Amino acid sequence: MFLGEYRHTIDEKGRMIVPAKFREHLGTPFVITRGLDNCLFVYPQSEWDKLESQLKELPFTKKDARAFTRFFFSGASECELDKQGRMNVPQPLREYAKLEKECVVIGVSNRMEVWSKTLWEDYVSQSEDSFADIAENLIDFDL
């Protein structure tokens, strides 16, 4: 399971150190793709396979299904960690997520997300006030 928030940097070649706690869960290979909210989603191969199966079931006759699967799969790239525990973030994905030098890596249960430091701070700032309302609308059990 992926949990926590970590601050990292991306070098000029697009390499980023993956938090040590996440490396074992990621395995090799793993998949990185465009996520929602201008972040990147990083999935272990087993989780990617589950998601791929679900998305393949969407009706291709539906415009939204075609748009989403195109967006999601066209940005996907299979990756491996190097000996230093770094992953290479492809240039188109760095551009999509507005990744420059500083980034934030967060754990979200079955996936890892990579955010621009600025976008993450903005997202947290905007979401903090509405967290209780979101929880009330989505969760049917007491925390």
Curated annotation (Swiss-Prot):
Domain SpoVT-AbrB as annotated: residue spans: 5-47, 76-119
Gene3D superfamilies (UniProt xref): Transcriptional regulator MraZ domain
Cellular compartment(s): Cytoplasm, Nucleoid
Keywords: Cytoplasm, DNA-binding, Repeat, Transcription, Transcription regulation
Cellular component, GO annotation: cytoplasm; nucleoid
GO biological-process terms attached to the record: negative regulation of DNA-templated transcription initiation
GO molecular function: DNA-binding transcription factor activity; transcription cis-regulatory region binding
Major place of residence: cytoplasm
UniProt-listed Pfam families: MraZ
Domain of life: Bacteria
NCBIfam families linked: division/cell wall cluster transcriptional repressor MraZ (TIGR00242)
Family per similarity comment: Belongs to the MraZ family.
Known partners and oligomeric status: Forms oligomers.
The name this protein goes by in its record: Transcriptional regulator MraZ
Native source organism of the sequence: Shouchella clausii (strain KSM-K16) (Alkalihalobacillus clausii)
Gene label: mraZ
